[in-house]
């Protein structure tokens, strides 16, 4: 239940829900009820004013299986995935293990803070074989949350080059 190791205690309601689930003694298939979907769609509506459909939501047991699934679903043999580095190593492994070339856009380390080299990123995104960009936010291992401006710039570059994020 994590994207990266975290150094704060998990919130009590989450711990209580996990303990309650464990005490049931039943660990079969998960069933996603309407209230789960409503919680997700409601959060996106409240937080971002996005109207998302229940059918758009897919569940994954973790980021690593999701990366492999995305690679197989959205990128064909001979195409490429753009990634920043440094990054959590399974990002690159998901491309490698699925026979896809990873294009590395190196982050700039400015006084201990990672920043995106947008000039280099844009050049690499312009390669017609680059079909997807794996966005890691918060950035792991650096822990940086990309700013709204940075995310919008990534989005614009990817949209202009038909690169799925």
Per-region residue spans from a language model:
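Conserved core of the PLP fold type I
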Residues: 27-159
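Low-complexity, intrinsically disordered or weakly predicted helical/coil tracts enriched
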Residues: 16-17, 123, 129, 164
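N-terminal "arm"/small-domain region of PLP-dependent enzymes with the aminotransferase-like
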Residues: 1-28, 163
């Amino acid at each position: 239940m994590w994207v990266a190791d975290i150094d704060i205690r998990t919130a009590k309601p989450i711990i209580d829900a996990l303990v309650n689930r464990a005490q049931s003694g039943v660990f079969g298939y998960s069933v996603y009820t309407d209230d789960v979907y409503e919680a997700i769609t409601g959060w996106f509506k409240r937080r971002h004013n996005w109207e998302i459909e229940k059918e758009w939501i897919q569940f994954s047991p973790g980021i690593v299986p999701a990366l492999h699934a995305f690679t197989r679903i959205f990128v064909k043999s001979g195409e490429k995935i753009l990634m920043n580095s440094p990054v959590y190593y399974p990002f690159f492994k998901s491309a490698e293990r699925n026979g896809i070339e990873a294009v590395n856009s190196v982050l700039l380390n400015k006084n201990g803070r990672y920043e995106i080299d947008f000039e280099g990123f844009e050049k690499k995104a312009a390669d017609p074989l680059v079909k997807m960009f794996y966005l890691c936010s918060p950035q792991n291992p650096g822990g940086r949350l990309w700013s709204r401006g940075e995310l919008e710039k990534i989005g614009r570059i990817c949209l202009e080059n038909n690169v799925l994020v």
